[in-house]
């Protein structure tokens, strides 16, 4: 999943990833969460209960649908699996406190000190952005409005908790934390330059070595 963009760019991976999506859907947990692996083998590291996997790995279900739409124009797969995605996002929302989720594998195997809630909430936000987009694509206007509102609340909570708007530092200011804030758009636009400067400085402080995790 992590290299799906690369594979989709070089190869015809539609059927391969469509099967992966189907496997996740088949193993969706009763409360709505998705498993860490599909087919499910019982692993649920830092999951959110009911046999669900960590929130970053649960993102695979929506993320792969996005890839198939972008690379192959497959809107049908988004329509077909929308009910399962909605059930999952509502499950994630039920696990949030003040619009934040505090558990995940986070910056896995990073050499830096990590804040699990920062990474988990960023993944939660991305889930909600994707279902908002999918609701728009499939003409579910009420859902689109509902999830747009939820995304705004998650972003506001993230900024209040983790973003130092004066300096542009996110969390502990590690390269991964700065990159997550930038990539997911979880910062006020007016401090983007400061956030980038903090990212560059964080990398420089580590002798230009990569200290982030593997996913």
Residue map of PLM features:
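Active-site core of glycosidic bond-cleaving carbohydrate-active enzymes
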Residues: 1-215
